[in-house]
């Protein structure tokens, strides 16, 4: 999914197929509207974290850190 | 002592009277149960009231104390527990239809520790379904309401615990906090709540929301009461893989040390930005009070702070959707509409989104570690707004612009959650409509003691925490 394209009910359909998640057709439009905003913000964060100054940063997946 | 006097006792005050047999645990428990019967039809703070069981435990506590065995400050004290925390033999629904008939065969570690300390479990409190949301507008067990104005929300997800404590139906409660679920209801209900460092308090037998951010902790009317509960539940638990080995300090011993020389950080363009005017004014007044107690205030830049809401939404979407994957496919209609939508959305992020959000946490944490070389704590409001009407999905913070509730509510509480740091919410005043405002104080990892010390000193110098809603 390109960040330049809006998320559509068809995009939701494809994602649900990939996730093996049955979502009734009537829910897809609402999900598309919400996901468009969430994915745009997540992509912005991903671009920030792809910056060279963060190249050595590893994810924290466990607290307390060991 | 009148019934009103009993209801207004703090844990410390009630404990002192119980220890010298001036107050009976049965009398105290009965007063709370009668209060629940009177006000909870309005508030809907409880999913299950453990009336008979609570009376039996209170009676046993009374007999023990008369026989000369006093277990400490929680002995005979009525405590409520959020309904996603296991209680052996008592239904634990997590606010859901899916777990509507679930009766655990074991206690959570935190429940067991409270029971061993002699606490009387008075009931299980309402919450946002599966703790995934900030309003406690629960489609299965009813909308929980704010004691200061029942037309307003109690926030969430531990909204039932917040409303129950503020309404004087228990002396303290346990909540859970992933992205703010203890601090948010503590703020809008005018009480104290602490999110601990991840690993400080066991999550064993607590229904998870997001494994890398979940915590359990107390909510009470005073910092001192939070400490009395925290001392009992904090500490290593071999049953929880995430539990820390860090030693538990003498929190009560630290409370009276005063604040002279303590350094508070305000995060530039963040700590006092994008908040309702009354919230900003109230926090500034609280800072002035703290300065009069000897703290020094410094502004610190934290360039990575922007991005925190997206990181939190990503992690808090993906992890719950993983836990709920099977039920979402077999029982989708048994979820409320908002939680079902969030769980479906959580399956649609990319793995790279999730991992970039977890990498962001490392960057944010490192900036806090640097900041803590200059200051001892950071301060923000707990929420940028006061309690909104029940059912609202939008909120207005400034410039007459409506914002999405879920993002707006996380503005300040998500940051310590992401960084794995402890944070205290303490009541610091009211807006013009009489709705409480809370201040969030963020500390170093495993330094809850400094948060308690600051909050206690503030409460010794002010009287916000002594005011009661007129229910």
Task: Please identify what each model-predicted range represents.
Chain B
Residues 52-62, 118-119:
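Long amphipathic alpha-helix in the N-terminal Rossmann-like dinucleotide-binding domain
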Residues 74-94, 252-268, 315-369, 381-385, ...:
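Short helix-loop capping/hinge segments that flank enzyme active sites or metal/cofactor-binding pockets
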